[in-house]
C-alpha cells in the first residue's frame, strides 16, 4: 500500500501530464495572425461592428448610418476631419438595425425618412455590398461618398488630384497651380460611365475601390461624365453617383440602385467578378432588400445586326424610360448586340454613332423573356447627306476640334491648351485647327472662309450647325458676307455649368439655316465669309459667358 508521500507524488505527476496535454491542445488551436478572424458582429451604444471574417472590420453608426471605421489589416482607413463615409453629406437621426439573414451574410439597414441604405458583408470577403433605395424627392440624394484618410494614400498625378495650396479658379471646385497654369477639379475624371467598372486609389500595399453598380436607376446614359474620385493632401473621396444634377439631361429615377461594392485589396485592382456585368447576385434574392429584382424577374434584348455603320466609329445601343436605363456596345463587324438583366417595361432604344443618336425605336422587355430584333438599317446619320463642304464629323462630340480631346481633363483656361482663336479655310484647314468651343466673351466671331463655283453660288444652300451642348442660352447666329440669319431660338440644355466641368455633353442639337443665293459672292475667286456669332439673352464673362460646343458644321 502506497504511503501518503507516494500518493502526493503520483497525483502531482498526473496533474503535470494533464497540464502539458492542455497546453498542447491550446497551442494546436491558437489561430495564427494570417488566418481568418471570426465572422460576426458586435454592438455597443454607438456602433455596430462587423467582422467580415477576412481582413476587413467596419463599423456603422447606430445614430445615422455613417460608416465610422474601415479597418483593413489593422489600420483604419475611414474618414478625415471628423467626416465619415455616407450617403450625400450624411443623414440625420436614422433607424439603424442589423441582422444576420444567413450564416454567411450580415446586413445593416438604415432608414432615413423614405430613403433606405443597406450595407451587406459576406463571410470571408474584404468587400461591403451597398444598396440605396430612393422613393421620392423628400431626401436629397446625389451620391454615396467613401471618405479615406489622405495621409495613407498618395496625391496622384491626375486631373482630379491636387494640393490644398492651389488657388481657386471657379466656384470653389476648380483649382489652378499658379506656377504652371494647370487646372484641377473633382469634375475632371475624363471618364464616361460606360468606360469604367471601378474607381479607387492604392498606396501599393492597400487599395480601396468602389466597383460601380449597373446604374440602372441613375441618370445621364452611357456617356455621362460625373464625379468618380478626387484626392488631395487633405481629402480622398470615392463616389457612386446616384443622381447628379451637373450637366444632367435625363430624368431622375427612383427605386433601388445597387449593389455597388466597396472593395479592399492588397494594393491591386478589385476582382473583375465584382463588376456589374459579372457579379452573381442570386445570394441577394433572399435578403429582403426593398426594390430588389432578381435575375428571374428581368429580361433581355438582342439585335441580329446593324446596317449602314461607318468604320472607325463605335456604336452603342442605349435603352431608357422613366424607370431605368441600360446600354451595350454593338459588334464592330456586324452590329450584333445583346443587353441583359433589364427590368420589364417599354424602352426607347437608341443607336448611337459614337455619341450621336442615329436611330430610335421602342422595344418592350418582359420578365424571363428575350426580345429578338431583326437587322436594323440606320437612316438618320447626317453624314450620309451630300454636302458642299463639312467641318468635323457628325458623331455627337467635339473631340476632333482644337482642344476638344482635353476638355474632359481640364478647364478652358488651362495653360496647356492652344489658343481659342482660329479661323478656318475650307479645303486647306483641318478640323483640329478650329476651336471646339465658342465663348461669347472669349473667341466669338470665328470666320470660315470658302469658295463656291458658279453653279453653287447661283442657288440657295442649307447651313447646318450641330452642337453637343450650350451654356446659358448660347446659340450661333450665322452671317454669310452681308447676309445675317434670323435670331435662332435657344436649344434645350442643362441649366448648370457645362463647358468648364469636364464635359461637353448636353443635348445634341442641329440648327438649320437657309442661306439665299444672293448672299454668296458671284466671283468664284472671291472668298465667302461665314461668321459665327454666339448670342444669348443671358450674361456671363470669360469662360462662363454664353457658349456652344461644336459637333459639326456643313453647307449642303
Predicted regions and their residues:
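A short, amphipathic beta-strand motif
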Residues: 297-309, 335-337, 376
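A short, solvent-exposed beta-strand micro-motif common in secreted/extracellular proteins
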Residues: 335, 345-355
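A contiguous, surface-exposed recognition patch within enzymatic or periplasmic domains that forms
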Residues: 149-255
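Extended, loop-rich substrate-binding clefts of extracytoplasmic carbohydrate-active enzymes
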Residues: 80-131, 143-145
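Structured interaction patches on ligand/partner-binding surfaces of diverse proteins
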Residues: 355-381
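Beta-strand-rich ligand-recognition modules
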Residues: 334, 443, 449-458, 466-556
